[in-house]
């Protein structure tokens, strides 16, 4: 009789912060994604599908959301200062307590 012992090494990476600043998410499908509390300053969401996504409490200053599909997306308590929202779809989007200072559509 042979006894085989398997040893598995599980590595869990814990990120010190949720920083995704200045990344390019252009033309991606991120339906239902959870970015809550993330640092997304300067990120590009050009023509990105973010329907039903959770972006609550996010730092999105200087981000580009040109043509983004934000239908039913949660952007509550987020900072959207100086964000480009041209052609973005905002039907049903939760913008409560959101800073939209100097943003334009």
Set out the residue ranges of the language-model regions:
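Bacterial N-terminal signal peptides
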Residues: 6-14
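Positively charged n-region of N-terminal signal peptides that target proteins for export
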Residues: 1-5
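Tandem repeat scaffolds
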Residues: 17-105
